[in-house]
Amino acid sequence: MKMSFRWYGKHDPVSLEEIKAIPGMQGIVTAVYDVPVGQAWPLENILELKRTVEAAGLEISVIESIPVHEDIKQGKPNRDELIENYKTSISNVGKAGIPVVCYNFMPVFDWTRSDLNYPLPDGSTSLAFLKADLADVDPVADDLNLPGWDSSYSKEEMKAIIEHYRHHISEEDLWANLDYFIKAIMPTAEAAGVKMAIHPDDPPYGIFGLPRIITGQKAVERFLDLYDSPNNGITMCVGSYASDPQNDVIAMTEYALKRQRINFMHTRNVTAGDWGFQETAHLSQAGDIDMNAIIKLLVDYDWQGPLRPDHGRRIWGDQTKTPGYGLYDRALGATYFNGLYEANMRAAGKTPDFGITVKTVGDK
């Protein structure tokens, strides 16, 4: 397991130097943020990003993400051109020696929350999705701008995209378009040595009348069967899947591990119900997920991929520029998961490697 941390590039208020100081931190999860969606990522842009990260004593473990253009998701006539650009980006990521790309196939937005500062009993705040708060909201009729929406579209363009999904794209249509996309990009990913890792819908159920397809175990089974290759894998985001109480994330994790198709792990805890869900501290008792059981499975199956602590609470006056992505609680999460990993590794008679170089006072 390689502990990793999301970094939003040079404009992220959390610095690489701060991330490097987290015990056992090895990898950075980041992206090229200055290339418009649909265009190919130039190799030099990726290499420049890599040099920046490596100068801080870290390495890029995952690209998260190369966004998929809405015209690909909707199966528009120009999708082949856009897919060729996507394949070029994958090839260039491989040339840069970066092993994993996380992406999603969610219509319109990457994630949705109704509240960015919902209070927890311990006095901290976190991200929450309260169904009642959005029950009467229509993103087309209302002047709405929710977090996770793609800011590269104007409001008028966004409304047109949403209406097209509602009236012309069913869940089966979206599956067909995903199948087309996967079969087109996977030979390139295999040749480039890049493992693709699809992220689940967040939340993993229908909202605003839009189709949602990567939502639970049956969806994961269907997705992995689209293209049988280790390069066609998933991001096992336990917090996203557990946002639907019907999902058994421990069983789902073991299923995907048995198939050797977890290419990236996101670990955050949530408490969920018919009312929606709220993100919590990472500790097992704080939410619905037995985090020790998750990490034990990774050890049992000798999983060697990148893992990052997902969204954190806002604590100790942490920054608010990137909701859920402050330094402090994610750092606590990283040390917590490394602790679970070490305990389970030693219980299995194995020695964990956190990539730490130990120096004494006399070392130069």
From Swiss-Prot:
Alphabetical UniProt keywords: Iron, Lyase, Manganese
InterPro entries referenced in this protein's UniProt entry, alphabetically: Man_deHydtase, Xyl_isomerase-like_sf
Pathway per the UniProt entry: Carbohydrate metabolism; pentose and glucuronate interconversion
Top-level taxon in the UniProt lineage: Bacteria
Entry annotated with the keyword Lyase: yes
Single GO MF annotation: ferrous iron binding
Cofactor: Fe(2+); Mn(2+)
Catalytic activity: D-mannonate = 2-dehydro-3-deoxy-D-gluconate + H2O
Documented EC number(s): 4.2.1.8
GO biological process, one term: D-glucuronate catabolic process
Function summary: Catalyzes the dehydration of D-mannonate.
Family named by the database record: Belongs to the mannonate dehydratase family.
Protein name: Mannonate dehydratase
Species whose genome carries this gene: Streptococcus equi subsp. zooepidemicus (strain MGCS10565)
Gene: uxuA
